[in-house]
Amino acid sequence: MVQPYRHEPLTDFTVEANREAFLAALKKVESELGRDYPLVIGGERVMTEDKIISINPANKTEVVGRVAKANKELAERAMKTADEAFRTWSRTSPEARADILFRAAAIVRRRKHEFSAWLVKEAGKPWREADADTAEAIDFMEYYGRQMLKLKDGIPVESRPGETNRFFYIPLGVGVVISPWNFPFAIMAGTTVASLVTGNTVLLKPASATPVVAYKFVEVLEEAGLPAGVLNYIPGSGAEVGDYLVDHPRTRFISFTGSRDVGIRIYERAAKVHPGQIWLKRVIAEMGGKDAIVVDKEADLELAAQSIVASAFGFSGQKCSACSRAIIVEDVYDQVLSRVVELTKQLNVGDPAEQATFMGPVIDQNAYNKIMEYIEIGKQEGRLMTGGEGDDAKGFFIQPTVFADVDPNARIMQEEIFGPVVAFAKARDFDHALEIANNTEYGLTGAVISRNRANLEKARHEFHVGNLYFNRGCTGAIVGYQPFGGFNMSGTDSKAGGPDYLILHMQAKTVSEMF
């Protein structure tokens, strides 16, 4: 019997045995660095001459892995394989599909620290961030497996005398999963298994910065019993392989997590009907945010400062949910700003393989350059309070950066930076603070720190974000507890880890029988 869902607990690294186990996992992963990884098409390993070189962002000279790189021809082969596999996989019982997710979750749980160690090396995640990423991957498998079991018989509808009506869900077809580098295990696994458990076959194109952990997950699903051809692993260029698959007439849906610009490009391309295409493609997209924490004059100011720092600088601000705007009512602006600067100066920036590190590197040279450009813009648009320096000699390290007195319409208050940068804006009162908070094209996460119930209730209705938090930070949604996804340019309003997410990967069918 399947037990009720509970989220995977995070590891307590104050326990010596846990620390030792994690260090052992790091040593194991270090001994496996630099290996070659193939594509997986129909269960067959396919090596290519062209490779994606995955490096450790904390140490540019350390190669994590060399991964085969798909081209259009191999993508077409994978599409034909997935299309063929759909015929049998779509008819596999929901119970059997869910069981594969449960077995995969158990395998990852046994190897939890190993997967987290890969995240330390490939994504530059500090211990706690890596551990949370792995736990979330487990949660997605456990939660979506259970959700499929709830949906397997459909939803009851009314029937008249002499009539039986059934309303149930069937799979869509071949899905293209384009996963991000910032949650290279959790989001990659979640979007993949949501597509699989609903009876679809998948072409997985992971982010080029983090393809190794995705390959490791493909191995887990194979071990869990996933049939060959149901999941095909085809890392490659977005401009070549990504566009080709988005345009392909046999692609039924695209599940994308990434930037606003790429998401818009995919949405536009998917809307075009190509020769031989007999459906309108579905796009499930999560595209980022410009998230704010609002603090009113009746807030717990220490909680406010702690929440801003944790939300702005966890994983170097490389979360779509990260706090990049702090909007403070003028009565308490100076106190909150001063405390945030004080706390930020205490943060330990360094090698994520060291337990004491709070903040590691940003993901790559392009990200480093972009963030440093925004810091220069910030120096013109606001008052630099701390940080602002970068060092890319060995890895891609940027100091946590705080800007004060920024105009709500400034670029660093409007554009997604995706790095360790937070901008402070002063509001006249709470209404003005909400007005500033809603003044972007995004609508992903937000938080309000306040003891005033009327203000919280006002924010509940007027703060237009998909995930709104009261008296806590704006990051760290838990699967099944805080379904995650935003409004406006933050995506297609889907809610990962929520009760209606799987339905996006299926279509409803009604069967009516007279007797």
Swiss-Prot record:
InterPro entries: Ald_DH/histidinol_DH (IPR016161), Ald_DH_C (IPR016163), Ald_DH_CS_CYS (IPR016160), Ald_DH_CS_GLU (IPR029510), Ald_DH_N (IPR016162), Aldehyde_DH_dom (IPR015590), Proline_metab_enzyme (IPR050485), RocA (IPR005932). The active site is at E286, C320. Pathway: Amino-acid degradation; L-proline degradation into L-glutamate; L-glutamate from L-proline: step 2/2. It is an enzyme of class 1 (oxidoreductase). GO terms for cellular component: cytoplasmic side of plasma membrane. PROSITE patterns: ALDEHYDE_DEHYDR_CYS, ALDEHYDE_DEHYDR_GLU. One of its GO terms (molecular function) is 1-pyrroline-5-carboxylate dehydrogenase activity. SUPFAM superfamilies: ALDH-like. The keyword Acetylation does not apply. The keyword Oxidoreductase applies. It comes from the Bacteria. CDD domains: ALDH_PutA-P5CDH-RocA. Keywords: NAD, Oxidoreductase. It catalyses: L-glutamate 5-semialdehyde + NAD(+) + H2O = L-glutamate + NADH + 2 H(+). One of its GO terms (biological process) is proline catabolic process to glutamate. Its EC number is 1.2.1.88. Pfam families: Aldedh. Belongs to the aldehyde dehydrogenase family. RocA subfamily. This is 1-pyrroline-5-carboxylate dehydrogenase. It comes from Geobacillus kaustophilus (strain HTA426).
